[in-house]
UniProtKB/Swiss-Prot annotation:
InterPro entries the record matches: DNA-dir_RNA_pol_bsu_ext_1_sf, DNA-dir_RNA_pol_bsu_external_1, DNA-dir_RNA_pol_su2, DNA-dir_RNAP_su2_dom, DNA-dir_RNAP_su2_hyb_sf, RNA_pol_bsu_bac, RNA_pol_bsu_CS, RNA_pol_bsu_protrusion
Any one GO CC term of the record: DNA-directed RNA polymerase complex
Gene3D superfamilies in the cross-refs: 2.40.50.100, 2.40.50.150, 3.90.1100.10, DNA-directed RNA polymerase, beta subunit, external 1 domain, DNA-directed RNA polymerase, subunit 2, domain 6, RNA polymerase alpha subunit dimerisation domain, RNA polymerase Rpb2, domain 2
Region (Disordered): 1-37
Protein name: DNA-directed RNA polymerase subunit beta
Family, per entry: Belongs to the RNA polymerase beta chain family.
GO biological process entries: DNA-templated transcription
E.C. number(s) listed in UniProt: 2.7.7.6
Residue stretches of biased makeup (Low complexity): 17-33
Subunit details: The RNAP catalytic core consists of 2 alpha, 1 beta, 1 beta' and 1 omega subunit. When a sigma factor is associated with the core the holoenzyme is formed, which can initiate transcription.
This protein's record includes keyword Nucleotidyltransferase: yes
GO molecular function, one term: DNA-directed RNA polymerase activity
Keyword terms, alphabetized: DNA-directed RNA polymerase, Nucleotidyltransferase, Transcription, Transferase
Length: 1178
């Protein structure tokens, strides 16, 4: 059975710290043993470590399966009887009774067996990483009292990996958390357009069931809509619930509008009110008192049909002040809920600010903001899967009921009643096709981590991008510390998809909480409290950088705080309730990795956060000189580095594994992933960073993965940058690079493509993977082994055969000679065609891996497939013109020119710069952070020493001792909103260490005199020079460049297809045609519109003329013209084509004989329309 938690807990324990904000003397990475010494410019000490970045996924899944880890955490919170997600569904479903109530079936105690195969094997063999789920089913015969109990298998249940992902059919997927409107009661205010009156309405929204809506209209009557049907007076509903007119008058006598509504209501008594409601809900059906009573009961008061869920009941009670302090049990509506809602609405319309409910509780009367995070909650992975299981179980319930009535009572056992197919199908459907189960973004470790922390308002039960307005997409004050205001997509999904903030967590109701330090009587304590958005609205919160002394008292008498709705003001320190735990509290992980974020415009910061996720892993990773302190935790939690589970000594190290002898005497071997292909074709490779004999502590990084160096996230390279125009070659964001980066593989990346082919049974016989391919020369087969599969290490290019395969052709009538051959040689002479797997057009590389699956090896293959072969081809891509590079501040560009290193501008000591960026890329875009990063990068690369002979300079007073001097190549961190200040940067630039010749290259203004590499002359003005962190993005020119000579045509228009995927041509569009016409290039234009496009007859005749060396014939009529005629004729218009002398021209259908003859002679296949794949063209 499965025991323990999903994720080991490495270094995430909370420690109490003093509230003092004195400077920490060691690296901020000190919570992780063996971390690189990155010195920090942070001025504030954070009282709380960053929580586990994958907790939003793992905690939710552990709740679903009810793991021991989750139960222990629930018990520590004081939850005496914690119920897991699966248990909850089984309790809801049980008991399933037959129609007479004589038999029942109950479920309990869900449990899992061991997973069927480890993660790597599942990926390799296209299996699902799953564990068998068993439940205890109990059948009770109420007539005899007989009880039969069995353990029933409920199917294989997909399990979450340690990294918070699922392996479904061999591919790694992520279930994204969904942001939805919470069930509850919502009051709204609108202005009537005709009378300009303020109108109020309220919706009672359940988790499952019919909506109940009340409103006050412009005639000042209170109405109700049940299940979105026609409006009727609210008093009808109250009477249907058993209230008399006297009771209504007694409860609502204070309200003029309720009295007028009662007067206009013509129904008398409960029965008439029930029948009136029934007629509105079921028009056309004969109403009876019983059916009307049952309908109303079922709609709102029966748990099977109506469910507010725990969160809905909590929200209703909180809003209306009901059942204060009582345990929440009922999840249906109550009569008191309905009455209290109506009273709240009436008082709201009358402008009252508070209302006292029957329990004596006074509640504020106000409208709700639907975009407030107090009213939006998260459906995390566990709840999403739980809902899907609930759907499957309810389908199974129907089957069980039917079987109870049809089967022999004596022979019934739980096993015979249960059909698990609907449950298995529902789970499969969710993981395979749901909008929220997504193909994992594995471009680099950060993209995977961000994907798991994504919040989506789209999906089933959510919004659609077409209907979502500006309000729901906008940044809201309640997002602070919960959802990042920066990181969101740029396209049509902007604002609908967000990212969880660094410190945020999800509470049991699904609301996002963020931590604050408690302030008591003006003193900041170490006590941390997590608040939801609506709780936070009731308090006054100070910023994390409000100055405080050693004892935690505010140094200033008036403190800058924020109140409800994001209002900012100064208040006395005694009025402050809470204080932020960290300046980076409001941003997400990717945004927190942008240094000097505080100096960047939000639009550019958004691009910077998004482009970090597109960075390609390079052959050799390099951590940034200027980081933010977030790099280490992000890399560890992303799960691509190898972390020591126990303290001990490294016993053995090789490229493939590391063996650690732990202090407790146990030995553990960690296997490295070597050159594996990620979901996005990038290379995932792990390499050890420890040596044999080294001492390691638990939680220490012992091997780097892709995009990591020494356990820190390393998405790009530190390059020497000059910010200047250069001969116009870096106009419009183009970038000029030094050839050194090409020659030394500085920005080289490895990309791995997977090619797959299978041999199936066809109607004409079995396909065969073989080296014996018809009409293929020996040179082409040189790299194939005896099975017909390419050898590992072979260099291949487009059109080369990777796997030889032949498919039987249709048998034709054999000639006597062929029959003789068949008789002599048997099957050898049968006709087969070449259907080999070839390298697609435009691709090349080296074969690095082959996997063969066949029935002989007991591999699971789809029906009809005999053998399956996968070939992995790796390509080393050097940086080239047209590739896209970017910094971390949204400063992106395409490489316009690669110059020889000797032509690049150089520093006075002869060092040529690596990259030239245009000055125009900064001022208008307002991302000044890139300039500050460039300056600090130079300081970090050069090293510095602050002259303290005459005392510490004013600008360095706040710097700790470790920042007074540093050796060259010292990595530094400047955390967001708490980093290096401009005056500190200026002082450090004046304090940099000289080079080996004793010269300082860059002055105190961050500029250097540069010399032109071509002439040796200095440029007229000093140029900003420094080190910037540059990333190579996934938009590579090799994937985009494309050319076509001949290829597939569209079936209807006979024009070439478009796009690289279809091996299409370049469209000569309307604007291009007009350009040709403007130049009077009539013959060229005619040629483009006919024989180069869709003149089917002319195409072949021209081909024939070229082959024979004859003159090009006259073009014919394009196929698209014939299509136009047909379109017009389909509209019943009689359209004829007339010659110049007015005679009708008949357009012949089909191919003419000349065409057939020419095609046969030239060996052209004219039937090739919309080819199924590019391989067919080779």
């Amino acid at each position: 059975m499965l025991e323990g938690c999903i994720l080991p807990d490495f270094g995430q324990s909370k420690t109490d710290v003093s509230p003092s904000q004195s400077r920490p003397q060691s690296s901020p990475n000190n919570s992780v043993p063996g971390a690189p010494n990155r010195i920090s410019f942070a001025k504030l000490r954070e009282p709380l470590e960053v929580p586990g970045l994958l907790d939003v996924q793992t905690d939710s899944f552990e709740w679903l399966i009810g793991s021991p880890c989750w139960r222990a955490a629930a018990a520590s919170r004081g939850d005496l009887k914690p119920v897991g997600g699966l248990e909850e569904v089984l309790y809801e479903l049980s008991p399933i009774e037959d129609f007479s109530g004589s038999m029942s079936l109950s479920f309990s105690d869900p449990r899992f067996d061991e997973v069927k195969a480890p993660v790597e094997e599942c990926k390799d063999k296209d299996m699902t990483y799953a564990a068998p789920l068993f439940v205890t089913a109990e059948f009770i015969n109420n007539n005899t009292g007989e009880i039969k109990s069995q353990t029933v298998f409920m199917g294989d249940f997909p399990m979450m990996t340690e990294k918070g992902t699922f392996i479904i059919n061999g591919t790694e997927r992520v279930v994204v958390s969904q942001l939805v409107r919470s069930p509850g009661v919502y009051f709204d205010e609108t202005i009537d357009k005709s009378t300009e009156k303020t109108l109020h309405s309220v919706k009672v929204i359940p988790s499952r069931g019919a909506w109940l809506e009340f409103d006050v209209d412009k005639r000042d009557t209170v109405g109700v809509r049940i299940d979105r049907k026609r409006r009727q007076p609210v008093t009808v509903l109250l009477k249907a619930l058993g209230w008399t007119s006297e009771q209504i008058t007694e409860r609502f006598g204070f309200s003029e509008i309720m009295r007028s509504t009662l007067e206009k209501d013509n129904t008398v008594g409960t029965d008439e009110a029930l029948l009136d409601i029934y007629r509105k809900l079921r028009p056309g059906e004969p109403p009876t008192k019983e059916s009307a009573q049952t309908l109303l009961e079922n709609l709102f008061f029966k748990e099977k049909r109506y469910d507010l869920a725990r969160v809905g009941r909590y929200k209703v009670n909180k809003k209306l002040g009901l059942h204060a302090g009582e345990l929440i049990t009922s999840s249906t509506l109550t009569e008191e809920d309905v009455v209290a809602t109506i009273e709240y609405l009436v008082r709201l319309h009358e402008g009252q600010s508070t209302m006292t409910v029957p329990g004596g509780v006074e509640v504020p009367v106000e409208t709700d903001d639907i975009d407030h995070f107090g009213n939006r909650r998260l459906r995390t992975v566990g709840e999403l899967i739980q809902n899907q299981i609930r759907v499957g179980m309810s389908r199974m319930e129907r089957v069980v009921r039917e079987r109870m009535t049809t089967q022999d009572v004596e022979a019934i056992t739980p096993q015979t009643l249960i059909n698990i197919r609907p449950v298995v199908a529902a789970i499969k459907e969710f993981f395979g096709t749901s909008q929220l189960s997504q193909f994992m973004d594995q471009n680099n470790p950060l993209s995977g981590l961000t994907h798991k922390r994504r919040l989506s308002a789209l999906g089933p039960g959510g919004l659609s991008r077409e209907r979502a307005g500006l309000e729901v997409r906008d940044v809201h004050p309640s997002h602070y510390g919960r959802m990042c205001p920066i990181e969101t997509p740029e396209g049509p999904n902007i604002g609908l998809i967000g990212s969880l903030s660094v410190y945020a967590r999800v509470n049991p109701f699904g609301f996002i909480e963020t931590p604050y330090r408690k302030v008591v009587d003006g003193v900041v304590s170490d006590e941390i409290e997590y608040l939801t958005a609506d709780e936070e609205d009731r308090h006054v919160v100070a910023q994390a950088n409000s100055p405080i002394d050693e004892a935690g008292r505010f140094l200033e008498p008036r403190v800058l705080v924020r109140r409800k709705a994001g209002e900012v003001e100064y208040v006395a320190s005694s009025e402050v309730d809470y204080m932020d735990v960290s300046p980076r509290q409001m941003v997400s992980v990717a945004t927190a990795m942008i240094p000097f974020l505080e100096h960047d415009d939000a639009n550019r910061a958004l691009m910077g956060a998004n482009m970090q996720r597109q960075a390609v892993p390079l052959v050799r990773s390099e951590a940034p000189l200027v980081g933010t302190g977030m790099e280490l935790r992000a890399a560890i939690d992303a799960g691509h580095v190898v972390v020591a589970e126990k303290s001990g000594v490294i016993e053995e190290v090789s490229a493939d594994y590391i063996t650690v002898m732990a202090d407790d005497g146990t030995r553990r071997t960690y296997r490295m992933r070597k050159f594996a292909r990620s979901n996005h074709g990038t290379c995932a490779n792990q390499s050890p960073i420890v040596d044999a004999g080294d001492r390691v502590e638990a939680g220490q990084v012992i091997a780097d993965g892709p995009c990591t160096e020494n356990g820190e996230m390393a998405l790009g390279k530190n390059l020497l940058v000059a910010i200047m125009p250069w001969e116009g070659h870096n106009y419009e964001d183009a970038i000029i690079l030094s050839n050194r980066l090409v020659e030394e593989d500085v920005l080289t990346s490895i990309h791995i493509e997977e090619h797959e082919i299978d041999a199936r049974d066809t109607k004409l016989g079995a396909e065969e993977i073989t080296r014996d391919i018809p009409n293929v020369s020996d040179e082409v087969l040189a790299d194939l082994d005896e099975r017909g599969i390419v050898r590992i290490g072979a260099e291949v290019r487009d059109g080369d055969i990777l796997v030889g395969k032949v498919t039987p052709k249709g048998e034709t009538e054999l000639t006597p000679e062929e029959r003789l051959l068949r008789a002599i040689f048997g099957e050898k002479a049968r006709e087969v065609r070449d259907t080999s797997l070839k390298v697609p057009h435009g691709e090349s590389g080296k074969v690095i891996g082959i996997r063969v699956f066949s029935h002989e090896d007991d591999d699971e293959l789809p029906a009809g497939v005999n053998e399956l072969v996968r070939v992995y081809v790796a390509q080393k891509r050097k940086i080239s013109d047209g590739d896209k590079l970017a910094g971390r501040h949204g400063n992106k560009g395409v490489i316009g020119k690669i110059l020889p290193a000797e032509d690049m501008p150089f520093l006075p000591d002869g060092t040529p710069v690596d990259i030239i960026l245009n000055t125009h890329g900064v001022p208008r875009r307002m991302n000044v952070g890139q300039i500050l990063e460039t300056h600090l990068g130079w300081v970090a690369k050069s090293g510095w020493k602050i002259d303290v002979a005459g005392g510490i300079p004013d600008w360095a007073v706040n710097l700790p001792e470790e920042l007074l001097h540093a050796a060259p190549n010292q990595i530094v961190s400047t955390p967001v909103f708490d980093g290096a200040k401009e005056e500190e940067l200026q002082g450090l630039l004046s304090s940099t260490l000289p080079n080996r010749d004793g010269d300082v290259m860059v002055g105190g203004d961050g500029k250097a005199v540069l010399f032109d590499g071509r002439s040796g002359e200095p440029f007229p003005y000093p140029v900003t020079v420094g080190y910037m962190y540059i990333m190579k993005l996934h938009h590579l020119v090799d994937d985009k460049i494309h050319a076509r000579s001949t290829g597939p045509y569209s079936m209807i228009t006979q024009q070439p297809l478009g796009g690289k995927a279809q091996f299409g041509g370049q469209r000569f569009g309307e604007m291009e045609c007009w350009a040709m016409q403007a130049y009077g290039a009539a013959y060229t234009l005619q040629e483009l519109l006919t024989i180069k496009s869709d003149d089917t007859v002319g195409r072949v005749k021209v081909y024939e003329a070229i082959v024979k060396g004859e003159n090009i014939p006259e073009p014919g009529i394009p196929e698209s013209f014939k299509v136009l005629l047909k379109e017009l004729q389909s509209l019943c218009l009689n359209v004829e084509v007339l010659s110049s002398d007015g005679a009708a021209i008949e357009l012949r259908e089909g191919e003419d004989e000349d065409l057939e003859r020419a095609a046969a002679n030239l060996g052209i296949n004219l039937s090739r329309n919309e080819s199924a794949s590019i391989e067919d063209l080779a």
